[in-house]
Regions:
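Canonical Radical SAM [4Fe-4S] cluster-binding loop centered on the CxxxCxxC motif
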Residues: 1-29
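Short, surface-exposed alpha-helical recognition segments that flank or form part
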Residues: 23, 27, 59-60, 131
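Radical SAM/AdoMet-radical enzyme domain recognition
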Residues: 33-52, 61-173
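Short acidic donor-binding/metal-coordinating loop in glycosyltransferase active sites
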Residues: 55-56
Length: 173
């Protein structure tokens, strides 16, 4: 959906802001939907596939995620296929509006969180260098409210020298 991110993770391969040095902001829905239709037309009947929304931070543009989801689901009337959807997010942008969008979707959500604030904030600070963990945990609480409406959600952690103590990390989660 976008390469841009609202955090500045130290281990980000995309330069910490998701741009890889390019001025890319977000995908064009007008270009993406015909490409998806072409892909789906190539599928065999009842074939399964997964669309993964990654970034950057895909929830910078939740309407784009919803548009793609709705479009793919609408194509099921024309051709039988089995789409699955996943989304990787830092969960810092899950407002009531975003939560309401997500709860209309059957989607598997992975929240990027490397451990407690002490650990997570080393690698995943906000762009101004402050803690992102409290925002992420607020987002996790929002996701808990819609857990039965969405496909599933869990935590995805990047293992680094800072969170190798699995007992401490496990205790946090």
């Amino acid at each position: 959906v976008t390469q841009i991110c609202n955090l500045k993770c130290h281990y980000c391969a995309a330069g910490g802001d998701g741009t890889y040095g390019d001025p890319v902001t977000r995908i064009s829905i007008e270009k993406t939907l015909p490409q998806l239709k072409f892909f789906i037309e190539q599928l065999k009947e009842n074939q399964k596939f997964t669309i993964s929304f990654v970034g950057g931070e895909p929830l910078l543009y939740p309407e784009a995620v919803k548009s793609i989801y709705d479009y793919v689901v609408s194509l099921q009337a024309e051709k039988k296929f089995s789409p699955q959807f996943s989304l990787v997010t830092n969960a810092t942008l899950i407002t009531d509006r975003v939560r309401d969008i997500l709860k209309t979707m059957k989607i598997h959500i992975a929240v990027s969180l490397d451990g407690s604030a002490h650990i997570n904030d080393i690698a995943r600070p906000t762009k101004d260098g402050t803690s992102s963990t409290a925002l992420t945990l607020q987002g996790v609480q929002q996701l808990k409210k819609i857990h039965s409406d969405i496909g599933s959600f869990g935590i995805s952690a990047v293992t680094t020298k800072d969170n190798l103590n699995i007992v401490d990390t496990y205790s946090f989660f």
